[in-house]
Amino acid sequence: MHALAKWVPGDHLGLDIPADADALRDGGTAFLTEAFRRAGALGADNAVVNLELAEFRGGSTGRKAQLTVSYGKPCDLPGELFVKFSRDFDDPGRDLGRSQMALEVRFALLTRTPGFPIAVPRCLFADFHDGSGTGLLVTDRIQYGCNGIEPKYHKCTDHSMPDPLGHYRAVFTALACLAGTHKAGDRSGRDFSVDMRRLSVG
């Protein structure tokens, strides 16, 4: 993908996806409406009618943004959203890890399955273009520190957690639920083979 070509076709849902926040702004409510419909999150009789997008820096790869939207009709979709781009055109080091989102997108799409065994942020859209490593993920925004969700902890600061044992018990319990569901044959793991080279940032 040329640096100026900020839209690429998604491999899963067949919709052209924006590679960065500027392209998403250009796509505006029309893109979000079609994207949410294509992912099965938004009905054909509803639409995204307004959006506000604010980028922030976080994590080790790609770019992130907070997205606030409103809908034409009342619905159960969240309005406070999180956006993750696999690409970072301003930082080659962060852009190097762009292929990591391939499996993340597949997992996000899988979470839309009725009866998915663990609680995760609701996925409104996810797609990835393998040829360029360009991906887009739009989910419900986690409200840390409220409604039973732990506060946001910085990486590598487990010593500051009030209950690290309880934290990791919850993490491994969720992983066990996923593994058990997979082994029971209700979810396919064929799309989640591990390639450590693709998971490496540097």
Regions found by a protein language model. Give the residues of each.
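Non-catalytic, well-ordered alpha-helical scaffold segments
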Residues: 62, 136, 169-173
